[in-house]
Amino acid sequence: MAQGEVVVKICGRATFACGADLKRLLGELRGRGWQRFTFDLTGCPLMDSTFLGILAGFGMKVSEAKGRKATLLNPSSKIVDLLDNLGVGHLFETQQGTTALADQCQPVELSGPPASKAETTRTALEAHETLMAIEPSNAPKFKDVIRFLAEDLNKLEPPSPPSP
């Protein structure tokens, strides 16, 4: 494996249910010094907007910090359409084929407990806000989702009372 390069293999449907764990994993990997990221989507037929929002936010951070884009390896045509429709395709390099790094992937255990419902909801809210910040034309698509998630989060984490 090249120094500072990591492959994150996404298997199955990439949805909000695993979004908080993905966000935590990516934070841990960056914290360990990994700088170049390839997301192997060979085994990922579908991706929802929450998962894409997390990837887009991460792709933006990596690009701004290191001046290079994260790579999406073998995205399906549905994922490419989603990237284009939500205006975030420019944040990534896309590549078809194989890479030696992807063949060397090994499972990694996340530290800490699984994400709570509140953390999952907060992650979904932030992901959709990211998609709207990157591409303002996404606002009409996600305004109701944002409202619903914010209301749900307020029920899960009521605001703390002001300090005396």
Predicted regions and their residues:
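STAS-like cytosolic regulatory interaction modules
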Residues: 1-43, 60-164
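Residues immediately C-terminal
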Residues: 46
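Histidine-anchored nucleotide/phosphate-binding helix
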Residues: 55-59
